[in-house]
A protein has these predicted regions:
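Terminal presequence/propeptide segments associated with secretion/organelle targeting
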Residues: 1-497
């Protein structure tokens, strides 16, 4: 009943909701329940000052009142199989890692192609477990017509807010309801008024029987990833360096957002989903830090590694693992720190991330229709004072905390021109076309009609800022960061045998 590929089982009633959450089917008409925070983006998307579903909740009284959503999907796990032997066929330990990767890709391709043809809406991926000691293929069926059915007011769905988030037990009505739709043959289909509620192979029947302390509980869904096996120095970096810095940066963003959201109902709706995303990781990182300290995780890791080192003293394959990991994590620290600040203080600025996304769309020849949709979606939920004030704070933090050798030369050049980060930010917002929808459309129309779109885009200071930091990150930070992590993965692969 738990997992079967030959008959309906619990796996057919549990779905992966939009790639990041679990959801469960609770009726024979495709009704599914997930967390309120998992459905929050679409509750916000449908909200307005006139119809504030975030504040008041939403309930579809009929099928016709259910709300279609953009950019949403649910995936059913069809099956998962151990394909280690097939994937590693032809592997020789003397191979380089790049040759091994090529072999794995070549051996995986036929498996993925065959599995993807097994049914409508099927897709497959081959993923490593235990740092490449084992490989599984996961086969999914994906549905994209998923409609909002109901959600409680945020006073219920987010009761306790950040104080209770990531804490247990807690008392909150953290749920929302959606319905999966399919074509007349019960297969995945793009949104259409002709689609009908999906008929699941299996669904969970809700019980209102009394529950007692100690009753058996079985949790079924799609959990996140574990870092259970990481090295002690990785734990130290997370608790002592990475999380404190990232939380500080997000605290400043949250303070700015909260200030303006409290002043305007429209801005509150615009930034509710963004604010939840920022605060969710902010609270998680606090819990990680406190948990590592409370449980003495670093000290326990160190003790275990010392015992491992004693055990490995007469085993050549394992003898140097811990010293090598110590050395590599020391080399990695600067690049990890620069990566954290690139993501949390540079790309965290909306205008800069918007510029990056536009540049990516142009480089992939997405076309005018795609760009029009991007512009419309961006400015629907954009409030310049929040972005500008946050940018001032985040760039100042970058200047204060990131060592010179980890910065792009562009940073020093601009500081020579403007003198302060505040003056630099003011210049960007005073001269960039990306601060208004009209200015953005004019700029992009010019770029679309130009023989060289990059020349047009790079005349705008927001694009220059985005491009310079991104190129520096890719060339000077991410390249060594990736290489060192590759070496760490190789050591973990041996460590986990």
């Amino acid at each position: 009943d738990i997992y079967s590929i030959n008959q309906a089982s619990l796996k057919d009633a549990s779905v992966h909701f939009n790639g990041g959450c679990s959801a469960e089917l609770i009726s024979d008409n495709g009704l599914l329940i997930t967390n309120h925070h998992c459905g929050y983006d679409w509750i916000q998307e449908h909200s307005s000052v006139e119809h504030d579903y975030l504040k008041d909740g939403f309930w579809a009284m009929t099928i016709e009142e259910e709300l279609p959503n953009k950019n949403i999907f649910v995936r059913f796990l069809v099956r998962m199989d151990d394909v280690t032997e097939t994937v590693l066929k032809g592997y020789d330990p003397s191979m380089t890692e790049s040759r091994r990767d090529s072999l794995i890709e070549a051996n995986s391709a036929p498996l993925i192609e065959a599995a993807s043809r097994e049914g409508a809406g099927y897709s497959a991926s081959v993923r490593p477990l235990y740092y490449g000691n084992q490989y599984f293929i996961w086969v999914y069926q994906t549905f994209t017509d998923v409609r909002l059915v109901g959600a409680p007011p945020s006073s219920i769905g987010k009761f306790g807010g950040d104080t209770d988030n990531w804490m247990w037990p807690r008392h909150t009505g953290d749920f929302s309801l959606f319905r999966i739709y399919a074509d007349k043959d019960n297969n995945p289909a793009a949104y259409s008024e002709e689609n009908v509620p999906y008929k699941p192979k299996k669904y969970f029947k809700l019980s209102i029987k009394e529950r007692k302390e100690g009753d058996f509980t079985f949790v079924y869904g799609y959990p996140g990833r574990t870092q259970e096996y990481i090295h002690s120095e990785a734990v130290r970096y997370i608790s002592d360096i990475s999380n404190p810095h990232k939380r500080n940066l997000r605290t400043q963003r949250l303070n700015v957002q909260d200030k303006y959201m409290s002043q305007s109902q429209k801005v509150r709706i615009q930034y509710s989903s963004k604010n939840s995303g920022v605060s969710n990781a902010w609270k998680k990182w606090l819990g990680e830090m406190n948990g590592i300290i409370k449980l003495k995780t670093y000290e326990k890791k160190k003790s275990y590694e010392q015992a491992f080192q004693q055990w490995a003293a007469d085993k050549p394959e394992y003898r140097d693992l811990i010293p090598q990991l110590d050395k590599l994590y020391e080399e990695l620290e600067d690049y990890s720190f620069a990566t954290d600040y690139y993501n949390e203080s540079i790309r965290a600025n909306e205008i800069i991330r918007f510029a990056e996304n536009i540049g990516t769309a142009f480089s992939r020849n997405r076309g005018k229709d795609y760009l029009d949709q991007m512009i419309e979606a961006y400015f629907k939920d954009y409030f310049i004072p929040i972005d500008k004030e946050s940018f001032h704070l985040l760039l100042a933090e970058y200047d204060k905390n990131v060592p010179q050798h980890l910065r792009p030369t562009y940073f020093a050049a601009q500081m020579n021109i403007f003198g302060t980060t505040d003056a630099w930010v003011e210049h960007i917002f005073a001269t960039s076309a990306l601060t208004t929808e009209e200015g953005t459309r004019t700029l992009l129309e010019k770029a679309l009609s130009s023989e060289n779109f990059q020349d047009v885009l790079l005349a705008d200071p927001a694009f220059v800022f985005s491009n310079e930091f991104r190129q520096h990150y890719l060339d000077e930070i991410n390249r060594p960061y990736t290489e060192i992590n590759r070496q760490i993965t190789l050591l973990y692969r041996t460590y986990m045998k």
